[in-house]
Amino acid sequence: MQARRKTRLYIVLAVLAGLGLTVSLTLYALSSNIDLFYTPGEIIYGKTETRALPHTGQRLRVGGYVQPGSLQRDPQTLDVRFKLYDARGVVDVSYKGILPDLFREGQGVVAQGVLDGERHITAQQVLAKHDENYTPPEVKNAMTPEKTGAQP
């Protein structure tokens, strides 16, 4: 009887250890694919709820409006630099590639990339809004002073 209990205990412990290892490896694999959404103000001052700041090297998506007069193109390459802003702040974005047709100053965009410095994002992808009347909800909420805590 005791030998049977010991065998069952070892089997249960082995199954639990295997399950724990599987969950750990799955969470580790998924964490490298998560891109959190930030606004320029949240990159500078932290998330409104938690005050958590993104760290250098973190993959993220940043949404805001292209600041008028900030677009700089290198005529020899596909390098582009511009600034994104919201009601609370401004961040620099650099991108190498062809921009979407709807990309222009004053329009809402989402840049997906890596935070290289305190206020600089190196984007791998830039998405422009697709319609004159559409603004992504995250960007719309970031631009309203009552949502951001900014004073009018």
UniProtKB/Swiss-Prot annotation:
Pfam families: CcmE. The chain crosses the membrane at residues 9-29. It is a single-pass type II membrane protein. It is found in: Cell inner membrane. Residues 1-8 are cytoplasmic. GO terms for biological process: cytochrome complex assembly. Keywords: Cell inner membrane, Cell membrane, Cytochrome c-type biogenesis, Heme, Iron, Membrane, Metal-binding, Signal-anchor, Transmembrane, Transmembrane helix. Coiled coil: none annotated. InterPro entries: CcmE, CcmE-like_sf, NA-bd_OB-fold. SUPFAM superfamilies: Heme chaperone CcmE. It comes from the Bacteria. Its main location: membrane. GO terms for cellular component: plasma membrane. The keyword Transmembrane applies. Residues 30-152 are periplasmic. Heme binds at H130, Y134. The keyword Iron applies. GO terms for molecular function: heme binding; metal ion binding. Residues 133-152 are annotated as: Disordered. Belongs to the CcmE/CycJ family. Heme chaperone required for the biogenesis of c-type cytochromes. Transiently binds heme delivered by CcmC and transfers the heme to apo-cytochromes in a process facilitated by CcmF and CcmH. This is Cytochrome c-type biogenesis protein CcmE.
